[in-house]
Amino acid sequence: MEKKFKLIYKDKEIKLVFNLNVMQAIQEEYGTIEKWGSLTDGESGEVDIKALKFGFTAMANEAIDIDNDDNGTDEPFFTTKKAGRIISDLGFDKVVMAINETVINSTKDDSEKNA
């Protein structure tokens, strides 16, 4: 379930991870993953910027935390302000697509295993 999606920002790789830790953070903030998803997918109107920044920050910080654990590094975590600057520079469409792909690719194997 821990598949990483990668974005390039200012010649640096940003990884996004959607796992149980990220799911828990989203549920604590938005109640359900489905509710958060409807706020960030843009299908029913304007993308909720706070929800987008929250999800992006949670996914990026989880990837940083995993890399820090795996590699013995101490890469700093993103703030929501930094996430906002990155999202603005990369563009909403690109980031929304990256978040959606991360969620879909991280969860599709689980449903196949349970079938």
Regions picked out by a protein language model, each given a short descriptive name:
Residues 1-8, 28-44, 68-115:
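Charged interaction scaffolds used for protein-protein
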Residues 9-13:
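Glycine-centered positions within short beta-strands or beta-hairpins
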Residues 16:
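Active-site-adjacent beta-strand anchor residues
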Residues 19:
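Residue-level signal for threonine
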Residues 22, 48-56, 95:
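Amphipathic alpha-helical interface surfaces
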Residues 25:
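Short active-site loop/helix that positions an aromatic residue
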Residues 51-62, 101:
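Short, hydrophobic/amphipathic alpha-helical patches that form generic packing surfaces
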